[in-house]
């Protein structure tokens, strides 16, 4: 059911606090249980991405639920190839830390969802893209973020797998040539929850202070 947006909403302090907790809650899940999502849950989450603001109302995001075992296996094979290549680029001490990280839940997650941007869409007639054509892909990034937050609010975990070759994934999934991969997502219920982020917990990187990210001119 669509929310009532007939008037400007008023959000109380409790809602704002809950929203901030959702933002702060680590979202990149790599360890999934085998429990399937409820019927219709994936479709509901994808439908909510329509509320993400696309440039020129282009709505360029395309979602592919990867159900075929052979296609999933091909994506996993490409991930393992790309991961081995990435691992080899680090010096020995850092490589050991990299190897110990769990960077994807491709084998465990009940749902694989590939998210593409349709670069050939005619919706919006190019509004807002002449100077910054990359805004089309950024619109899909916002759709992914909306999906991610909506999923976590429902207790569903999402992991974004970027260690793949986009051209290989597009070929494996047999999508139109104008579709460009933005995100390959693992989706399912988390096997475990943590209040800290996995990369910080395992010594890869700490959070940057917000004071260093805002400047004035």
Where are these regions (language model features)?
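Glycine-rich phosphate/pyrophosphate-binding beta-alpha loops
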Residues: 51-56
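Conserved hydrophobic/aromatic beta-strand scaffold that supports enzyme active sites
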Residues: 22, 112-114, 184-186
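Glycine/small-residue-rich phosphate/adenosyl-binding loop
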Residues: 59-140
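C-terminal helix-cap and adjacent tail motif
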Residues: 2-15, 28-29, 183-217
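Generic beta-strand structural signal
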Residues: 109-111, 154, 181-183
């Amino acid at each position: 059911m669509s929310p009532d947006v007939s008037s400007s909403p008023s959000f109380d302090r409790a809602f704002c606090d809950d929203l901030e907790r959702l933002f702060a809650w680590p979202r990149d899940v790599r360890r999934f249980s085998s429990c399937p999502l409820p019927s219709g849950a994936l479709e509901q989450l994808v439908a909510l991405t329509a509320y993400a603001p696309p440039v020129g109302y282009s709505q360029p995001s395309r979602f592919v639920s990867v159900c075929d075992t052979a296609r999933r296996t091909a994506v996993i094979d490409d991930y393992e190839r790309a991961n081995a290549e990435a691992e080899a680029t680090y010096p020995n001490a850092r490589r050991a830390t990299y190897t110990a990280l769990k960077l994807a839940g491709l084998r465990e997650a009940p749902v694989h969802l590939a998210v593409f941007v349709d670069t050939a869409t005619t919706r919006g007639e190019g509004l807002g893209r002449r100077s910054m054509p990359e805004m089309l892909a950024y619109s899909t990034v916002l759709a992914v973020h909306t999906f991610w937050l909506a999923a976590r609010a429902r207790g569903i975990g999402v992991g974004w797998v970027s260690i793949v070759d986009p051209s290989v994934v597009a070929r494996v999934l047999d999508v139109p040539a104008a579709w460009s991969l933005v995100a390959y997502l693992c989706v399912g219920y988390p096997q475990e929850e943590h209040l800290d982020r996995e990369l910080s917990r395992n010594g890869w990187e700490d959070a940057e202070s917000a004071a260093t990210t805002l400047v004035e001119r």
